[in-house]
UniProtKB/Swiss-Prot annotation:
Full protein name: Adenylosuccinate synthetase
NCBIfam families documented for this protein: PRK01117.1, purA
Organism whose genome encodes this protein: Drosophila persimilis (Fruit fly)
Cofactor: Mg(2+)
Binding of substrate, residues: 321-327
GO biological process: 'de novo' AMP biosynthetic process; IMP metabolic process
Cellular compartments annotated: Cytoplasm
Pathway: Purine metabolism; AMP biosynthesis via de novo pathway; AMP from IMP: step 1/2
Keywords: Cytoplasm, GTP-binding, Ligase, Magnesium, Metal-binding, Nucleotide-binding, Purine biosynthesis
């Protein structure tokens, strides 16, 4: 037995020796740590000024990111926020689902605001799946059928498109650019499948095919094998930043299922959505809003259905970029953040919208969950039934009641504001590297 153990031990040691690394650079990742709307776009915009490539890896135009650059506010849904940096290549990866009409509408709207030369610096994966109009119709119908138990979907067709992908009758961008007769046959087949399930949807097949023949030529200049492109970039030492869409608590596996999106918006989705191996990942930046918000239905332990929630909603202008719905608001939730940090492995935190708390005399932070019988939970609940029955315990921290909006040095923040940041660091055992106190990239304070 001891000989076998010794042999196995030596083999295991050998497994970890002599590793070679073909890559000269790493991929840094920006992920939402709550239920979205944390300010990821602003963080990406800040970092994109120093990187070569910015990528989207999952989701579709159900995501909404706002970036303020040189006084102009840009809204992005499919485009990576890094497109505002003209020196940067933007990549839409294979894990993204793309509604081409929405993509080109977004391009036109942002070009009107001054975005230029996208045709030279936007690359779309040939393996990304297409979202069709009938996917959007089905999304709305499925949501309506749920009645009072709706999931709060954006009705952008994202779920049905991922369903088509999973059942292997979806259509990829590369297929649109290949033999158009083969694309037409496949399109007719997927429409017929949906009509059997949803006979009330109306699809003019010939009109759609005419439309997509035009889209094929329009999108063709942007399409590449992004997997080879990214691996070549890494071998050549190019810096790559990934912008996660949605957020950890909306992840199809790790979020508050079924009140989630249809993709993996945690670290695993970065690997599968871009074709990257784990060893390429460098920094994992968790973006945390200084309080918690959620759009749509689903459990929300620290939600404040009172004047505090109203104040946070009003001061934070908490309205969804994509849905235009008011966001639900509540206190910062440490157990939730510990959980998403476990899943994602944050190496640092960017804390955003600290200035929204400026007027409060005291600030509560959710620090633990208790079961109905009073026992403390040592894990994040895996079902919405369990999550709905917990009691939240809060720590009460002193507010600072001073404007932080124009402060640009961490040491100049009010002492209680600094304490709030350090409290989060201590509870998560993850350093807070940046603090946001306003809209533009210039309002992000470097802590260290």
């Amino acid at each position: 037995m001891s000989t076998t153990n010794a042999i196995n031990g030596n083999l295991y040691e050998q497994l970890h020796q002599g590793r070679t690394n073909m890559y000269k650079s790493k991929v840094d990742v920006v992920l939402g740590a709550q239920w979205g709307d944390e300010g990821k776009g602003k963080v990406v915009d800040m970092l994109a000024s120093e990187v070569d490539i910015v990528c989207r890896c999952q989701g579709g135009n159900n995501a909404g990111h706002t970036v303020v650059a040189n006084g102009t506010e840009f809204d992005f849904h499919l485009l990576p926020s890094g497109v505002v940096n003209e020196k940067c290549i933007s990549v839409i990866g294979n894990g993204v689902v793309i509604h081409l009409p929405s993509l080109f509408d977004e391009v036109l709207k942002n070009e009107a605001k001054g975005l230029q030369h996208l045709e030279h610096r936007l690359i779309i994966s040939d393996r990304a799946h297409l979202v069709f109009d009938f996917h959007q119709h089905v999304d709305g119908m499925q949501e309506a059928e749920k009645g009072g138990k709706s999931l709060g979907t954006t009705k952008k067709g994202i779920g049905p498109a991922y369903s088509s992908k999973a059942t292997r009758n979806g259509i990829r961008v590369g297929e649109l650019l290949g033999d158009f007769n083969a694309f037409s046959d496949k399109f007719k087949l997927i429409v017929a499948t949906h009509l059997r399930l949803f006979p009330s949807i109306n699809v003019d097949v010939e009109a759609e095919l005419t439309r997509y023949r035009d889209y094929a030529e329009k999108v063709r200049p942007y399409v590449k094998d992004t997997i080879c492109f990214l691996h070549t970039a890494l071998r050549n030492g190019k810096t790559i930043l990934v912008e996660g869409a949605n957020a950890a608590m909306l992840d199809i596996d790790f979020g508050t299922y079924p009140y989630v999106t249809s993709s993996n918006c945690s670290i695993g989705g970065v690997l599968t959505g871009l074709g990257l191996p784990p060893q390429t990942i460098g920094e994992v930046i968790g973006v945390v809003k200084a309080y918690t918000t959620r759009v749509g239905d689903g459990p929300f332990p620290s939600e404040q259905l009172n004047e505090i929630g109203d104040l946070l909603q009003t001061r934070g202008f908490e309205v969804g970029v994509t849905t235009k719905r008011k966001r639900r608001c509540g206190w910062l939730d440490i157990p939730l953040l510990r959980y998403t940090s476990l899943v994602n492995g944050y190496t640092c935190i960017c804390l955003t919208k600290l200035d929204i708390l400026d007027t409060l005399p005291e600030i509560k932070v959710a620090v633990s969950y208790k079961k109905a019988n009073g026992d403390k939970l040592d894990h994040f609940p895996g079902t919405i039934a369990e999550l709905g029955n917990i009691e939240v315990e809060y720590a009460v921290l002193p507010g600072w009641q001073t404007s932080t909006e124009h402060i640009r040095n961490f040491k100049e923040l009010p002492e209680n504001a600094q304490h709030y940041v350090r409290f989060l660091e201590k509870e998560l055992s993850v350093p807070v590297r940046w603090v946001g106190v306003g809209k533009g990239r210039e309002s992000i304070i470097n802590v260290h």
